């Protein structure tokens, strides 16, 4: 990845994705408010651990497919671009369904599991990261490099949400804490239905 402008564009896209509300951020906030900062940070670290796994698997799969069918990269570019547009429009006009889904496990495992079972994470890694690959000779290494950038940006976002939510809501009433839990379960139901 020698082209700084491509890396810069990727970082901007990733920052906009990492700091926008989603399942992991909702879980980080919920755990931070309900159980404290430590649990929110554990979710963030669990999610980052899941992202390492997703990075390695998706990079390996994409590299294998690319070596078999080099032209597939064009289709992945198109699909990735369409996915970015779809997510942008879906975010603008989203409404929330009401289904109650709970994860009964420790915070680290909750973050890890939620990241691994979230199909949107897999789609992002499989379709968006290849858009920013500039050299097909180093395809695998560039995907892993982009995955590492993604993991660090997501981790910074998740830690920021954990620290801020635990600080601002530490003295909140039980009513506010229940509202945050309900909001999380609604978001989770909405995200897994899409």
Feature names for model-found ranges:
Residues 38-110, 164-167, 171:
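Membrane helix-loop-helix hairpins that form the core translocation module of multi-pass transporters
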Residues 144-165:
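Hydrophobic alpha-helical transmembrane segments of multi-pass membrane transport proteins
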């Amino acid at each position: 990845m020698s082209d700084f402008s491509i890396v810069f564009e990727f970082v901007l896209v990733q920052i906009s994705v990492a700091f926008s509300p989603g399942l992991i951020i909702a879980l980080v906030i919920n755990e931070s408010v309900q159980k404290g900062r430590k649990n929110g940070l554990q979710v963030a670290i669990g999610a980052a651990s899941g992202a390492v796994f997703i990075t390695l698997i998706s990079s390996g799969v994409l590299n294998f497919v690319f070596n078999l069918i080099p032209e597939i990269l064009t289709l992945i570019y198109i699909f990735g671009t369409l996915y970015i547009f779809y997510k942008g429009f879906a975010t603008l006009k989203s409404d929330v369904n009401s289904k109650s889904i709970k994860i009964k496990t420790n915070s680290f495992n909750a973050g890890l599991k939620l990241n691994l079972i979230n199909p949107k994470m897999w789609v992002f890694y499989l379709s968006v990261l290849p858009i920013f690959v500039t050299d097909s000779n180093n395809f695998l290494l560039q995907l892993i490099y982009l995955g590492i950038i993604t993991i660090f940006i997501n981790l910074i976002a998740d830690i920021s949400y954990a620290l801020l939510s635990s600080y601002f809501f530490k003295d909140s009433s039980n009513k506010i804490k229940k509202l945050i839990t309900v909001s999380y379960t609604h978001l989770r139901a909405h995200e897994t239905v899409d």
